[in-house]
Amino acid sequence: IHPNAEGAGILAKTVYGGITGNYGGLQLSGLYTDDMVLQRNVPLDIHGIANTGDQVTVSIAGQKASAVANNRGEWSVVLQPLPVGTDYTLTIQAGKQKKEFRHVAVGEVWLCSGQSNMAFRLNQAATGKKDIAQADDPDFRLFDMKGRWETYDVAWPASCLDSLDHLQYFQPTTW
């Protein structure tokens, strides 16, 4: 293997974590934020990364579950299903590190995917103005993962290809 400086850094970080068990402490997917939505009426699988051997405790709505991070730093807990609600607090703690997510909703989670059909905006529809005026749901939440680059028939510059090489497909977003 003859990596460049960046590749050597990735290899070093991976080997360091494997040898020491230090994976940078408590880490979660970008989906875990204030105002996020969890699926109702199904067991809740909460997972992330912590240092090897760290006990991670997760609590929400009076429930609490713990797990120990394995030798790759991975941990996962499963909590009992929750009913629909809009003001839960999800707390995740590993040692002195604590992450608290407020205004968590429990309800229906829909995953939508596509290309041009997903780029179509409601205000472009024939009945869009009427539909928008009737849309009055303060508990509706959207996690819109927009692509980092346009996918039309255009040549991509080197900066675009570099970001794709680094698995940066989407723009940063929140709920």
Predicted ranges, named:
Residues 1-23:
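Catalytic His-Asp segment of secreted/periplasmic serine-dependent ester chemistry enzymes
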Residues 24-175:
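Cell-envelope and extracellular/periplasmic
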